[in-house]
Amino acid sequence: MSKKPPNRPGITFEIGARLEALDYLQKWYPSRIEKIDYEEGKMLVHFERWSHRYDEWIYWDSNRLRPLERPSLRKEGLKDEEDLFDFKAGEEVLARWTDCRYYPAKIEAINKEGTFTVQFYDGVIRCLKRMHIKAMPEDAKGQVKSQHPLSWCCPIDPAGSCNQSMGSEDWIALVKAAAAAAAKNKTGSKPRTSANSNKEKERDGGKWFKVPSKKAETSTCIVTAEIEKKEELPTSSEPFGLHIDSVPKIVFPQPESTLTNKRKNNQGNSFQAKRARLNKITGLLASKAVGVDGAEKKEDCSATAPVLEQAISPKPQSQKKNEAVISSSANTQKPALLSSTLSSGKARSKKCKHESGESSGCIKAPKSPLAPELIQAKDLTLVSQLSSVINKTSSPQPVNPPRPCKHSERRRRSQRLATLPMPDDSLEKLSSSSSATDGKVFSISSQNQQESSVPEVPAIAYVPLQKLGPCLPLDLSCGSEVTGSQAPDSSYPGGECPREEKEETPLFANPTSKVVSDVKGAAAATGILKTEKKVKLEEKTSTAFGKRKEKDKERKEKRDKDHYKPKQKKKKKKKKKSKQHDYSDYEDSSLDFLERCSSPLTRSSGSSLAPRSTFTEKTTTYQYPRAILSVDLSGENLSDVEFLDDSSTESLLLSGDEYNQDFDSTNFEESQDEDDALNEIVRCICELDEENGFMIQCEECLCWQHSVCMGLLEDSIPEQYICYICRDPPGQRWNAKYRYDKEWLNNGRMYGLSFVKENYSHLNAKKIVSTHHLLADVYGITEVLHGLQLKIGILKNKHHPDLRLWAYSGKRKDQDQVVAGAERKVILQDTANSEGRKYVQNHKEPPLKMEETYITSEHSYQKPQSFSQDCHSLTDPGSSDDDDVSSFEEDGELHVADNSHLLYSVKERGVSEKNPASENKVFVYNDKKGMEGPGDAHLQWQLNLLTHIENVQNEVTSRMDLIEKEVDVLESWLDFTGELEPPDPLARLPQLKRHIKQLLLDMGKVQQIATLCSV
């Protein structure tokens, strides 16, 4: 087959090029070329978003390959007529927003790449492709008189007054005309049902009053309600922001009336069902209606009232004229009922809008006196009907309740925690401080606007005043005295407000921006560690929003009474643990971990590991538990929603005298310790994260288990308890379970059966430790002998590349290093670790310690090891295998070298320096290189190596003598116990094997018995 790829349009035969490939199931998938075989003429094709095991070799001329982007004739045939238009700069069009709906816009500029810069009716400028722009109907063009950037609300003239009637009516006319033109274009379509009755109108700008949260991707709480409303509106409803003077003079344009007649004929009998659905969402429309009016800041300070009744209950044309009069008469007939409902709905809709990131304003129509002839008797009945509908629908569970976003919830909690708690009587005074104003409609100012809406939506998130600033009404005639009982009257049929919502009001006495700016950074500004930790804890847990102080007190009493003693006992045990064991050979991270556990203060300061403590989910609990900060919730479930919600600043702190009986420490330490107690984790084999009965705590991960589930009683807890996960961590090697059995190596203690009174390992701990030291010394000798074999191999081979590392003998250092014995351990461990792997990488030998270090440590083998140092390694109870091996390496045959130069280490320059020999290096043998011949140099190198081998052999002999003495000590202990002198070990070897095999069988049976009994 040819080595040149074929010419296939749309396919680039390069590695990484994208195309479409047909898999064996005859489905086309986007794919990528991984490899190309020019010999065979095929390619390795990777199907995107599939595993690489599905990669397939396909011939490059196969019909299973096709271009990724191919022209679609079907799509081209379905192009609309409006695609033929060529738009110009400054032309009015319908542009598509991110919610896939079209809104009135104006073309600002036409870019080179075929995109259009458009400015939407609300001032937002975006760059759109041609496909997202539609021509505006001719009868809708040129009707906009005001092009203020905030045209969705009332346009503001230079004098600052609100040209509301002009801007609103113009946009209404534009939208109505666009809807009518769209309806004319669809003459041949089938009759519309109630579900899609207004769909084209929505696309062609039906959302002219859209809440500007579209810039934050259209918050769901408002958009959902508006979509429902728009799909079910028989006509375009009257605007929310109409000037009140224009209400009696409403003239409906001719296109709307003809459209209404068409719709009535098409819809048929679907009106009644639609009417019932409209009644359900009336409450939401009432609250949403005020969400779109906004930016009225410099309004006259007379008493104001939003006229929203036209939009509350959308009705057919016959009822619309009546409601135009209702809207004007509502102020005098039912002021308290309607206005309280609407104002509380306004606060709620403002919160919904601001949760999606909005900071733009809201408009409010000024109240003007109404002519008395507009008030009619049948209008009054409609007003009462409307108010009853609002009463029903504005219950605490609306159809589409606005969901609070998490960010605002956190801000609200930080406000509560940062503010000093106020007494209950001040709360009541705050909520019911002023008398009810029945004769006039009030407007809610600043923070009190939020307070009145709290009973409506208990789960709403509070928004700081800085964000609410642009949309706060400036009618301060009522001051801060706002009736707190009117909103509950309209929302709760019984006329009473649940008290848990009343206590949830934010405790701000002064609603100024200065206070809010302090509150916004409350967690950082206070500088109190406990407040920050509580906020973090509350953020992690999904909490309900009710707050009952009686329950809080009962919870505290129950916590103090029932679950304090087991925690006390375990805390004492934790302190004792860190004193009685030697953890010198643990890892560094483990040392930090143990320091955390040793005292209350250091435990809390080490809580930077707390992000790992998210073990409330069952599926993610089984992780390696090294860095878990677990604490005791004192009888409370971590997932208990109300406990965390009740945790205000004072309720989470236990008083200092409760801990004086346990710790002799300061109050600060007690509070820190109790603060850790909030993070404790229950991780038991039963997978229940609640505390019942007696609890035991793992000494490694500090997680708590039920003693009943673990098969342990209160009087049978072992000295060292390690949980089942730490002993057998999932995802680790099987030998990781012995990580916590270092008691056996350090102290010679092993777990025994609980019913055996005398544990053999406890009685013979010293002998076991001595045996361990003996084995460690034997292991170290084995490593040294292996290193000697390697060196002898280098000595025999004259051309070995590593022979030049012995270019300089270390004999001259005898005079310099008489003092060096003491500091040797400090300096050389890092050196051996940092440069010790070079030889292993070159020669691929087994990674034993001596072969790593026989080339890479210093020429200090000339000074023989003193007997006292060897005895010290024997008698030190805390030393382990690593100590013995490293002590021999350091004293036996240490020298530092590089593959290219012989380097003196830092010890040659000064013994007490602690950094490795990477900075102060002295080049020695380069000076001699020119004077000596190559044959003499090799001979000298071999001589130096031979001397080194002899010294190491002397050290091995010395160490063997010490091992023999260790064996003598163990045998003397055997004689001291009265046992007979053991016979020749070789003769006992078969018997020993049988005994070990029998012991393994017995241990297997014991393990099976223990497994069955624990269940």
From Swiss-Prot:
Species of the source: Rattus norvegicus (Rat)
Modified residues (Phosphoserine): S368, S432
Protein name per its UniProtKB record: PHD finger protein 20-like protein 1
InterPro entries found in the cross-reference section: Agenet_dom_plant (IPR014002), KDM4-like_Tudor (IPR040477), PHF20-like (IPR043449), Tudor (IPR002999), Tudor_PHF20L1 (IPR047405), Zinc_finger_PHD-type_CS (IPR019786), Znf_FYVE_PHD (IPR011011), Znf_RING/FYVE/PHD (IPR013083)
Biased composition annotated in UniProt, kind: Acidic residues: 879-889
Pfam families for the chain: PHD20L1_u1, PHD_5, Tudor_2
Keyword entries, A-Z: Acetylation, Isopeptide bond, Metal-binding, Nucleus, Phosphoprotein, Repeat, Ubl conjugation, Zinc, Zinc-finger
Domain called Tudor: residue spans: 11-71, 85-141
Subunit structure: Interacts with methylated DNMT1 (DNMT1K142me1). Interacts with SOX2.
Highest taxon listed in the record's lineage: Eukaryota
